[in-house]
Amino acid sequence: MGRRRAPGGGSLGRVLIRHQTQRSRSHRHTDSWLHTSELNDGYDWGRLNLQSVTEQSSLEDFLATAELAGTEFVAEKLNIKFVPPEARTGLLSFEESQRIKRLHEENRQFLCIPRRPNWDRKTSPEELKQAEKDNFLKWRRQLVRLEEEQKLILTPFERNLDFWRQLWRVIERSDIVVQIVDARNPLLFRCEDLECYVKEIDAAKENVILINKADLLTAEQRVAWAVHFEKEGVKVIFWSALAETVHLNGDSKDEVNSVAGEANSSESEDSSLDGNEIPHRDLFLLSEESESDDDDSEYEDCQEDEEEDWQTCSEEDSNPEEGQEEGGCDRDQKEHGPEDSEAQSRASPENSQMSNKSHLVSKQELLELFKKLHTGKKVKDGQLTVGLVGYPNVGKSSTINTIMGNKKVSVSATPGHTKHFQTLYVEPGLCLCDCPGLVMPSFVSTKAEMICSGILPIDQMRDHVPPVSLVCQNIPRRVLEATYGINIIKPGEDEDPYRPPTSEELLTAYGCMRGFMTAHGQPDQPRSARYILKDYVRGKLLYCHPPPGKDPVAFQHQHRQLLENKIKGEELRLQPGKTQKAKQVENVVDKTFFHQENVRALTKGVQAVMGYKPGSGLVTAAAASAENVPGKPWKKHGNRNKKEKSRRLYRHLDV
């Protein structure tokens, strides 16, 4: 027997525990000054359903907040605003866009560019610089006041005074001021106040709008824009620097091939060809100080020969009426001589009032149009100066390089690449002046429109959703799928079946197709957005804004043509009786796999399975009998086909 314990001495702990349990179970508590968790002086949490809530929709979050607000619940509930997911696109609704357009038309007269203050020879450089700063500051305050009072959004215009000073100098020294605009949206890049400022400086100066990238427009679209500007009394010229460069390069290659084929004919022909090649070099190296009168005469003869060659081009075939007018006029001038042509130009008043033509002009036609536009007194005697101005990335430098015949001006896809104006002599008496690109103040609905128009750099954008949403709104779903060969997810059953795809749907499909993935295995939407937006700016995804009064959907002839070509291709493919070979795509992985010289099967375990031995392939009867020889079976001498791990054998296939 063990030692007997004192009665009640060891049960004190159990008594305390039992008392605490009974106290917690009892509902009759006496008031106490002790601070315990059982005080009934707070909110009764027991009546609530304590269910964890980690995610709430916007509506549930609002209703929960309104319920917590108590007395303000009714007032807040009356102001409920349902925000659909499409609101994140950053685009305006139809009603908002119409309202903003009306405000733009009402306040368009307040948009202006800064003027250079009046100066004369007595004005010192310091006084002129201070006056320019004062006028520039006043101009900026006027635009800020317009934004604050009218609640309008202006484009992020140029705020560097030095760029505007270069524009002033280009306008002052130019006889013809050419605004280069993008053919896909000419009204966005056109500045009407710039035309007024040119006339304010000198009424003899001429304004011309050069619609670049006009090869992206169809003939019907060019006619519509020509008629629109004709009604407004503005001279326009349709031009494509890229298409003309390709055309000139093709002609030069044909000339080189023809010269190489006729090189062995006679020595006299070789000497004449050498004489014709020298003026072409003078075209590239021409300057005002180094050329003599003899070289000028040779240059003019060469240019006349090139004009005759150009008139035999396919321009007459594409537009016979206009080709007869242009070509016939030039031939008459060549036949009757320069004196008759000058008399004809003085006699006909049509040269001062030119009608807008919708055909694409060539390099020589463009230079001839410049010479015909300005016939009055020039800023510099004996020299016609043509100033090229406009927004960034509309093709000013590309136009100069095409006219000059080689790379005279640096070109970049990034807007604002040209930093300083420069003058270049095309021929004696004709000078081109390139001005840096200026973002002039204009009304805009959203910043996404400026990114899609190429005004703002794509690589510097912060939010990719609004511009991609604008692309989805302008380009139909079927055109996007046909262009990239992707399948965009269809709208749900409770959605509009004809709604445009969202930016997330397009970027997800494009990213999966191109393999643009993030570190977490999701499609890289920002990277895909940069590719799609650059295709939109380049014209691969083509959308052309119509003139005022035209239906934007009916104006997109290229979309219908693309879809018709796709439907015709599918019909030809599905025609019975025509077996077309399936297009075989050469895959490097498949080609390497099926051309292996050593192919073997691997099995698990150490025993041979159906004639196969691990690591050695098929086991023959002779080899099996040789292995069963008496001796030391545990010795495996010369075992070169021992079992190896599969991950070592095929580690070259691991990615």
Curated annotation (Swiss-Prot):
It catalyses: GTP + H2O = GDP + phosphate + H(+). GTP binds at residues 212-215, 390-397, 434-437. Keywords: Cytoplasm, Endoplasmic reticulum, GTP-binding, Hydrolase, Nucleotide-binding, Nucleus, Phosphoprotein, Protein transport, Transport. Pfam families: MMR_HSR1. Its main location: cytoplasm. GO terms for cellular component: Cajal body; cytosol; endoplasmic reticulum. The keyword Manganese does not apply. GO terms for molecular function: GTP binding; GTPase activity. Residues 16-28, 633-655 have a biased composition (Basic residues). Residues 344-359 have a biased composition (Polar residues). The keyword Acyltransferase does not apply. Residues 288-327 have a biased composition (Acidic residues). PROSITE patterns: G_CP. Residues 328-339 have a biased composition (Basic and acidic residues). InterPro entries: G_CP_dom (IPR030378), GNL1-like (IPR043358), GTP-bd (IPR006073), P-loop_NTPase (IPR027417). CDD domains: HSR1_MMR1 (cd01857). Residues 1-31, 253-359, 625-655 are annotated as: Disordered. Residues 164-441 form the CP-type G domain. Its EC number is 3.6.5.-. It is found in: Cytoplasm; Endoplasmic reticulum; Nucleus, Cajal body. GO terms for biological process: nuclear export; protein transport; ribosomal subunit export from nucleus. The modification Phosphoserine is found at S93, S97, S252. Functions as a GTPase. May act by mediating the release of NMD3 from the 60S ribosomal subunit after export into the cytoplasm during the 60S ribosomal subunit maturation. In contrast to other GTP-binding proteins, this family is characterized by a circular permutation of the GTPase motifs described by a G4-G1-G3 pattern. Belongs to the TRAFAC class YlqF/YawG GTPase family. LSG1 subfamily. This is Large subunit GTPase 1 homolog.
